[in-house]
């Protein structure tokens, strides 16, 4: 079983999968009579159908036991999905490129710095939210509308991957 190498999350490395949502290194302009920096359009919400709505939710996630066998990935074919950490904790991101099914050899893992969020582009394969704290909260921006917006792919036992944060140290 291949152990995923966990990479630091950067805009350049994550670009094939979506957007890194962060203020560091991002352009801004002043608003509110000069008292507020607006970091504008850090990510774009994608929706596939005209009647779709962009919605905001909060996910409260429990830590999964590590090392973790990556048995499945999911994708949202009708809209993007963004996760922004509310408690400032780093979290793990596991992704694979667009395609009919995720290719195990192309799966990548990233570690955020706690001040970064991610916006998965429409159709990008990813693991459900992976907190490394006992519990963590995320502001989630995604799509509401008709049609199935969650495809799941389960790997065969031979294709499964291992996510082990301790192996990177």
From Swiss-Prot:
One GO biological process term: allantoin catabolic process
Catalyzed chemical reaction(s): (S)-ureidoglycolate = urea + glyoxylate
Gene3D superfamilies for the chain: Ureidoglycolate hydrolase (2.60.120.480)
Pathway: Nitrogen metabolism; (S)-allantoin degradation
Molecular function terms, GO-annotated: ureidoglycolate hydrolase activity; ureidoglycolate lyase activity
Stored InterPro entries: RmlC_Cupin_sf (IPR011051), UAH_cupin (IPR047233), Ureidogly_lyase (IPR007247), Ureidogly_lyase_bac (IPR023525), Ureidoglycolate_lyase_dom_sf (IPR024060)
The UniProt record lists the keyword Lyase: yes
Cofactor(s) of this protein: Ni(2+)
Superkingdom classification of source: Bacteria
EC number: 4.3.2.3
Transmembrane segments: none
Self-association and partners: Homodimer.
Role summary: Catalyzes the catabolism of the allantoin degradation intermediate (S)-ureidoglycolate, generating urea and glyoxylate. Involved in the utilization of allantoin as nitrogen source.
Family listed: Belongs to the ureidoglycolate lyase family.
Protein name per Swiss-Prot or TrEMBL: Ureidoglycolate lyase
Species annotation: Pseudomonas aeruginosa (strain ATCC 15692 / DSM 22644 / CIP 104116 / JCM 14847 / LMG 12228 / 1C / PRS 101 / PAO1)
